[in-house]
A protein has these predicted regions:
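Conserved C-terminal region and hinge/linker of Rieske [2Fe-2S] proteins, especially
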Residues: 1-165
């Protein structure tokens, strides 16, 4: 049974996220056993994947409503740079994650599942599957996510993708 509190709204969820990250940042990592460090690093990677899924969905919705125009920005990418103070390179990665939400539903689902796909692997798979005709892409991505769930690494996923194409 989980003792984690479920947030009541998005603001509360963001506060909990910041609190949890702050707790981890304040740990005396030098005094932690290697096994605990490894567990934290794996957990952070999983959290990063779930955050990427959330960011992609939020950016997709923000784009649809032309939210960037309210702040006088021409595009969501420039809005990200000026309003969230990220670099252009980071904004480009966020836009790639947005594309996952809009065009690669199976890969987005793989980000949300524990330890199935990392953000970097999902983005790589999206690049590889772009060459697959649209009517077959979702099925191909489902095959790749299932292979990742079964333990396939990036090399095996590349081979599967090459075979599908």
């Amino acid at each position: 049974m989980s003792t984690v509190t479920v947030p009541a709204n998005a603001g509360e969820a963001l506060g909990m996220l910041e609190c949890a990250a702050g707790y981890l940042a304040d740990l005396d990592a030098a005094q932690m056993p290697t096994e605990a460090l490894a567990g934290c690093l794996r957990g952070l990677e999983q959290a990063d994947a779930v955050q990427a899924a959330a960011r992609g969905q939020l950016l997709a919705a923000f784009d649809v409503t032309d939210g960037h125009l309210a702040d006088g920005q021409r595009t969501t990418r420039t809005w990200l740079v000026h309003s969230t103070r990220v670099t252009r390179g980071q904004a480009a990665e966020y836009k790639a994650v947005q594309a996952l939400a809009q065009e690669h539903a199976p890969l987005l689902a793989g980000l949300r599942e524990g330890y199935v796909l990392t953000k970097s692997v999902a983005l790589q798979l999206a690049r590889w599957t772009r060459a697959i005709p649209g009517e077959f892409r979702a099925q191909a991505e489902e095959i790749l996510v299932a292979a990742a769930r079964a333990g396939a690494g990036l090399r095996e996923l590349a081979a599967i993708c090459a075979e599908i194409r």
